């Protein structure tokens, strides 16, 4: 019998972690992963359903797999809208929602029974990872308690469920032992970690720690590898972790989605509504940790956004001088409360505001990177091509931030650290020469 499984993972890093866990279980039970539809006995597709374009990509992928294989199991965020999937592809074998690991594995069992004698010893202790060996995503919770009007994640993934502290730290240790040099801490709401447990006290390596954001960061910092924080909601207690960055326990990098600067728009989004307070906090963080890199994301064209309110966002951007910024044009997501707001912004205006926003940020980024010329940066080697080395600095998360390009020399390996002298820059990337390897 064919025990081969095809797997397609769509969407964000949180979905990628879900895929890794499903694949780890399947591999532990003796299934073989194959890269083509035609070789697979069944195909699993982990979908995204956050915005319309993601829904369409997921549906297109399901249709393609059905056409080329015909035996398809669907899971992930779009699985919460089973009727949408069934209307497009009525013959899929099974549909489940996000983080339904056991349900997916059971569905595979039903339609493609496992081998009688799985070679479980072939599974590494850290599980199967879909990222390069030197970095890994570490998911610390599921779900979200926020009620942002533009988002339906709580509907698809449920309320906050923090993973046990010992489970997270054990996984982190195994990843380090497997050679991982960088942990990217992710969840729907990273800084809310532990709220649902009422900060339960647990024992870890002979000491008592609280199930809360600060304690988790402190314990991860003791691993001695890069720890990068993503999706950090701007709660007041986020201020407490900045000294950990200053002291080198975790990377001086904070991914903190702010979404807008105008107070009326923020209230309509049900987000923290004080750009003045945010600017004061940013100044405080930089005073405590001058090397901190601040990344954020914003939405332009939110329903009712006026030209004056958009101009306020641009003014905030210029004053905040954030290091890394992403921007999204508002997209009405089925089920989001923001869809009911008056005065939707036209697509032409959204597009125009998006380009104006990105022009402002490109200039900010260009000037910030120009100031790094002549400095020495610790970099992590991501890739070595025929003629160059591609790396990232402490300021750069994989996939979403800039890169450091270096001339190729011998003795450097992917996943190693090195010191690089920066000689040039552009809008988003740095260029330099290797000074020496840190191994």
UniProtKB/Swiss-Prot annotation:
Q: Which molecular-function annotations from GO does this UniProt entry contain? A: 4 iron, 4 sulfur cluster binding; aspartic acid methylthiotransferase activity; metal ion binding; protein methylthiotransferase activity
* Ranges of residues in domain Radical SAM core: 130-367
What Gene3D superfamilies would the database entry show?
Answer: Methylthiotransferase, N-terminal domain, Nucleic acid-binding proteins, tm_1862 like domain
Q: Where does [4Fe-4S] cluster 1 bind?
A: 12, 48, 77
UniProt domain TRAM: residue ranges = 370-436
Q: Where is the MTTase N-terminal domain?
A: 3-113
Residues annotated to bind [4Fe-4S] cluster 2: 144, 148, 151
Q: Is Amino-acid biosynthesis included in the keywords of this UniProt record?
A: no
Q: What class of enzyme is it?
A: transferase
The record's Gene Ontology biological-process terms are:
tRNA modification
> EC no.?
2.8.4.4
Q: Taking the first listed entry, what is the main subcellular location of this protein, grouped into a coarse class?
A: cytoplasm
Q: Which UniProt keywords apply?
A: 4Fe-4S, Cytoplasm, Iron, Iron-sulfur, Metal-binding, S-adenosyl-L-methionine, Transferase
Report the co-factor binding details: Binds 2 [4Fe-4S] clusters. One cluster is coordinated with 3 cysteines and an exchangeable S-adenosyl-L-methionine.
- Could you tell me which InterPro entries the record lists for this protein? Elp3/MiaA/NifB-like_rSAM, Methylthiotransferase, Methylthiotransferase_CS, Methylthiotransferase_N, Methylthiotransferase_N_sf, NA-bd_OB-fold, Ribosomal_uS12_MeSTrfase_RimO, rSAM
Q: Report the locations given in the UniProt record.
A: Cytoplasm
One cellular-component annotation, GO:
cytosol
Catalyzed reactions: L-aspartate(89)-[ribosomal protein uS12]-hydrogen + (sulfur carrier)-SH + AH2 + 2 S-adenosyl-L-methionine = 3-methylsulfanyl-L-aspartate(89)-[ribosomal protein uS12]-hydrogen + (sulfur carrier)-H + 5'-deoxyadenosine + L-methionine + A + S-adenosyl-L-homocysteine + 2 H(+)
Record flagged with keyword Nucleotide-binding: no
Cofactor(s) needed: [4Fe-4S] cluster
Sequence similarity: Belongs to the methylthiotransferase family. RimO subfamily.
Q: Which HAMAP family does the record associate with it?
A: MTTase_RimO
Q: What does this protein do?
A: Catalyzes the methylthiolation of an aspartic acid residue of ribosomal protein uS12.
Q: What is this protein's record name? A: Ribosomal protein uS12 methylthiotransferase RimO
Q: Which organism is it from?
A: Legionella pneumophila (strain Corby)
